[in-house]
C-alpha cells in the first residue's frame, strides 16, 4: 500500500514515522518533506508544494495512492480534500467549507455562538475606530486575533490597553498579517490552563486522541511573543477523566453535530484549543483542522494503534468500530529553534550532533531542515523536536533534554521548562 502525507514539518515527520509502522505500507511519499523524512525507512520525499493542489492530485493518481493524510492547514483551506475526492482519491481531512473552522476566526466564533458551545465573549471588526472603542470599553487584558491564517502567530494577548490598540492598528491599517488581518476578532481574555484536545472525526463518529499541552510563548515561564509552539507533552493532567467527558459532551459532539446540521459534515483531525478554568469548565480558544505541531510528536510516540488503519476507518465512516490504544508512559517534545525565531532567523546553518543510532523511547523529529551537499542544515524557525517517553513527565523531560543537549548549530535555542505545569502537579503528589 502507498500513502501520501502532505507537509514538511515535525508533525509530518511524526505522522510518516508512525504510518510506516503499518506492515502493509510499502512506501510513504511526503510532499515536500524535510531532511529527516528523507532518511526515514519507507519514506520518500516528493518535491511538490503543499499548495500545488493540481500537482498533488496528479501525483496521487500516477502512484495509485490509497491514503493521503494532510498535515498543515493551508492546503485544507484552499480545498485539497475537495479536489482529491472529485478525483476519487481517498484522503483524510476536512473539505474547504469545513476547514473554515480554522480558516476564519470570525466564522468559528459565530458558529460557537449558534451552537451554544462555551467560548469567550467577542466581537468582529473590519474598521479601526469601532474596534478601538470596543477595547476601551472592555479594558485589558484582552485578546486581538487576525481573522485568517497567520501560521499560529496572528494572536496578540494584550495585557495593556496600549498593546491592544497597537495590535488593532497593525492588523487593520498596517495589515501586519497580509490578507489575514483585514478583519479582527477581539475577545475576552480567558484565565486558566490550556489543553490541546485532538480527535479524529468521520463526519459523525469521534475517536479521541491522547490529550496534550502545548507551550506557545517563545520564552521560559511563558514570556515573549507567541510562536507556532515551543514544545508539548502528553497526556495533559489538567484533563481529568471528568473534564475529558465534559469536553466531549460540551464541545466536541456539539461541534461535529453542528457542522453536519449546517451541511458541512466534518471529516479529519479536529483540534480544539481549550482553556480550562479552575471549576473545570472548558472554553474553546480556537479550532485547528489538523493535528497540532509540536503536539503530534509526543502523541505519536505514545500511539500504540495503527495510524493508517484509523485513517482508513475514518474515511469509511467506521470510527465507531475501532479504538485507539496508548502507551501509559508520558511523552515530551522540545522544539529546537533558530536564533531570532519567531521573528527573522538564519537559514543554512549546519546542524551537528544528530543521533546516529535511535534509542527506544527517544526520537528527533525534523521540521525546518534541509539536505545541502551531504550536510543537514537549518531551513526554518522551528528546526527539530527532541522527543522522549518516560514513566513520569519529569523522566520524559529529563530524557528529552539529554537528547537535545547532543545537538547544536549556530544560534540554536530552546525553552528550558517544557512540561513545567505537569511536573509541578507530579511534585504535589
Swiss-Prot record:
The gene is purD. Its EC number is 6.3.4.13. Residues 213-223 have a biased composition (Basic and acidic residues). Its cofactor is Mg(2+); Mn(2+). ATP binds at residues 135-196. This is Phosphoribosylamine--glycine ligase. GO terms for molecular function: ATP binding; metal ion binding; phosphoribosylamine-glycine ligase activity. The lineage of its organism: Bacteria, Pseudomonadati, Pseudomonadota, Gammaproteobacteria, Vibrionales. One of its GO terms (biological process) is purine nucleobase biosynthetic process. It comes from Vibrio parahaemolyticus serotype O3:K6 (strain RIMD 2210633). It is an enzyme of class 6 (ligase). Binds 1 Mg(2+) or Mn(2+) ion per subunit. Belongs to the GARS family.
Amino acid at each position: 500500500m502507498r500513502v501520501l502525507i502532505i507537509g514538511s514539518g515535525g508533525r509530518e515527520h511524526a505522522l510518516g514515522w508512525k504510518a510506516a509502522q503499518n506492515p502493509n505500507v510499502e512506501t510513504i511519499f511526503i510532499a515536500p518533506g524535510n531532511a529527516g523524512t528523507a532518511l526515514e525507512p519507507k519514506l520518500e520525499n516528493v518535491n511538490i508544494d503543499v499548495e500545488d493542489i493540481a500537482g498533488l492530485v496528479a501525483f496521487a493518481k500516477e502512484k495509485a495512492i490509497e491514503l493521503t493524510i494532510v498535515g498543515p492547514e493551508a492546503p485544507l483551506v484552499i480545498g485539497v480534500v475537495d479536489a482529491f475526492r472529485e478525483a476519487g482519491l481517498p484522503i483524510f481531512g476536512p473539505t474547504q467549507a469545513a476547514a473554515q473552522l480554522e480558516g476564519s476566526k470570525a466564522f468559528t466564533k459565530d458558529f460557537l455562538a449558534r451552537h451554544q458551545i462555551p467560548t469567550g465573549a467577542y466581537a468582529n471588526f473590519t474598521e479601526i475606530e469601532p474596534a478601538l472603542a470596543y477595547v476601551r470599553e472592555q479594558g485589558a487584558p484582552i485578546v486581538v486575533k487576525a481573522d485568517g491564517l497567520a501560521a499560529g502567530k496572528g494572536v496578540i494577548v494584550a495585557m495593556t490597553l496600549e498593546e491592544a490598540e497597537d495590535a488593532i492598528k497593525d492588523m487593520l491599517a498596517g495589515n501586519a498579517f497580509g490578507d489575514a488581518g483585514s478583519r479582527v476578532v477581539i475577545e475576552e481574555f480567558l484565565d486558566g490552563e490550556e489543553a490541546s484536545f485532538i480527535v479524529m472525526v468521520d463526519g459523525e463518529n469521534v475517536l479521541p486522541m491522547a490529550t496534550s499541552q502545548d507551550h506557545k510563548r517563545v520564552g521560559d515561564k511563558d514570556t515573549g511573543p507567541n510562536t507556532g509552539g515551543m514544545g508539548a507533552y502528553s497526556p495533559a493532567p489538567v484533563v481529568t477523566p471528568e473534564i475529558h467527558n465534559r469536553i466531549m459532551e460540551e464541545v466536541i459532539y456539539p461541534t461535529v453535530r453542528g457542522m453536519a446540521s449546517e451541511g458541512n459534515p466534518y471529516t479529519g483531525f479536529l483540534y480544539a484549543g481549550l482553556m480550562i478554568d479552575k471549576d473545570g469548565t472548558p472554553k474553546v480558544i480556537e479550532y485547528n483542522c489538523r493535528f497540532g505541531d509540536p503536539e503530534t510528536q509526543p502523541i505519536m510516540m505514545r500511539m500504540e494503534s495503527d495510524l493508517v488503519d484509523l485513517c482508513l476507518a475514518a474515511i469509511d465512516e467506521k470510527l465507531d468500530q475501532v479504538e485507539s490504544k496508548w502507551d501509559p508512559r508520558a511523552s515530551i517534545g522540545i522544539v529546537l529553534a533558530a536564533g531570532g525565531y519567531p521573528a527573522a532567523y538564519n537559514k543554512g546553518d549546519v546542524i551537528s550532533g544528530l543521533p546516529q543510532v535511535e534509542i527506544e523511547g527517544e526520537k528527533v523529529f525534523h521540521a525546518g531542515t534541509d539536505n545541502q551537499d551531504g550536510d543537514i542544515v537549518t531551513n526554518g524557525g522551528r528546526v527539530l523536536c527532541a522527543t522522549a517517553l518516560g514513566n513520569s513527565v519529569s523522566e520524559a523531560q529529563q530524557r528529552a533534554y539529554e537528547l537535545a543537549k547532543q545537538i547544536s548549530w549556530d544560534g540554536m535555542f530552546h525553552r528550558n521548562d517544557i512540561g513545567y505545569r505537569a511536573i509541578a502537579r507530579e511534585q504535589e503528589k
